[in-house]
Structure formats: structure tokens, C-alpha cells
């Protein structure tokens, strides 16, 4: 009788363990943000502008969704982008951001595997450009 109970318990444990190992990793929604400042630009600007971006990243679909605002810029934003690059380094445009010229903006994009890896590794930043600061007026590293 004890042997039967032990075998049944062991079988149940092994089946549960195998099921857990066979189940694919669960997708997660990661909350992210970027605080936009002139001092974060490379090189820094003397702008009084500021801004913020909040974002969510779905690790299964690789969809990045964002909302942001900018204010106090030297003039209207002429462009805004997510760039690939570590803090203190400039990098290429990864995803354009529409609507920053209005002061507030939102959007979404589906990332490639390489882009998703860079984003999750802290190697992306948001940059807002103006006519007076063509290379970028305010910038913020995207963090979790």
C-alpha cells in the first residue's frame, strides 16, 4: 500500500515537473520610461526644454507602445525618434516618432528581434530635434 502511494505521488510529481519544463516562457509586458533633458544630449545643449516618455513593451509580440510630451523647446520639434545607443553615445534611428511637433505624441511599432534585444538591454534612447538643435535638443535613455 505504501509503495503504491509513493509511486503515485512520484509519478504525479514527475508529470508536473515535465509539464512545467515543456511550457514555453510566458510573455511579459515591460513598463519603460525616458526622462528627456538637454544635459543628456551628446554633446549637451543649453535648452530649457524637458520631456518624458512612458512606454510598454510586449515581449511576445515585440510591440512597443509609447506616449510622451515635450515643452520649453527652442521651437517646434522637427523630428523625434527612438535611437539605438547607450547612454553617452549617439546611434542611428531605430523607430521614428510622429507628432512631437504638437507637444504630445503617442504611437506604436513592432520591433525586430535585434531591436527588442537592444531595447531590453538599455541601449535605446529618445531624441527630439528642433531647427536650432538639428542633432537633438532633448534626450533620454529608455529604462525599465
Named regions from a protein language model:
Residues 2-17, 22-80, 84-144:
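Metal-centered catalytic cores of metalloenzymes
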Amino acid at each position: 500500500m505504501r509503495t503504491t502511494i509513493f509511486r503515485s505521488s512520484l509519478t504525479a510529481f514527475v508529470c508536473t515537473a515535465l509539464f512545467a519544463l515543456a511550457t514555453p516562457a510566458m510573455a511579459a509586458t515591460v513598463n519603460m520610461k525616458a526622462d528627456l533633458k538637454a544635459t543628456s544630449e551628446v554633446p549637451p545643449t543649453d535648452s530649457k526644454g524637458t520631456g518624458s516618455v512612458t512606454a510598454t513593451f510586449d515581449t511576445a509580440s515585440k510591440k512597443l507602445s509609447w506616449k510622451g510630451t515635450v515643452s520649453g523647446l527652442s521651437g517646434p520639434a522637427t523630428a523625434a525618434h527612438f535611437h539605438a545607443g547607450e547612454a553617452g553615445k549617439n546611434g542611428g534611428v531605430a523607430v521614428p516618432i510622429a507628432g512631437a511637433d504638437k507637444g504630445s505624441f503617442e504611437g506604436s511599432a513592432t520591433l525586430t528581434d535585434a531591436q527588442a534585444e537592444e531595447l531590453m538591454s538599455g541601449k535605446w534612447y529618445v531624441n527630439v530635434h528642433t531647427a536650432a538643435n538639428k542633432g537633438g535638443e532633448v534626450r533620454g535613455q529608455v529604462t525599465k
